[in-house]
Amino acid sequence: DFRASLDKMGFQFNEGRIIDASFVVAPRQRNTREENKAIKEGRGSELWNDKPHKKSHKDVDARWTEKRGEKFYGYKMHAKADQRHKMVLKYDTTSANVHDSKGYEPLLDESDEGKELYLDAGYESQEPIVERHRMKPVICEKGHRNHPLTDEQKKKNREKSKTRCLVEHVFGFMEQSMCGLIFRRVGI
């Protein structure tokens, strides 16, 4: 297997871990209001049974979401990468409307024990889950209304971000070198 080959060549994935998520755009669906209602209620598999060709082109798993005023339709890829090599060690795909902090736990396993886990501010409330997996959470802090970050917190965030941003290189590579993060399949 690929991972065993890398181990034989001396690649060691013993550094910390970095987790983040990125949108994967899917083709927009042209459904009627009734069809959309059925999909949202979880009855998407019951639709178009009399038209198998049409059903094979319909995606009932993709969802709409909005981030910073921009709307996305599709999925979200959650990835865990090695801190040193930027190698994706594990990934999972959810619909786009799932919050980053809800889709990362399946990526954690026993091989991560004792390692640092770098996360952005969106995972702020996830420290107990990370600690339950015997990892050391390194999470950027987030300011809140009427409670902005102090200069000391900003300085700590900059230090954490120097490592955490490496996972952005992984998504950037996929987007630039691998024809983007576009889902070319129907359904998860």
Q: Where in the sequence are the language-model features?
A:
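Helix-centered, glycine/charged polyanion-binding patches within enzymatic domains
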Residues: 116, 121-188
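Polybasic low-complexity intrinsically disordered regions
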Residues: 1-133
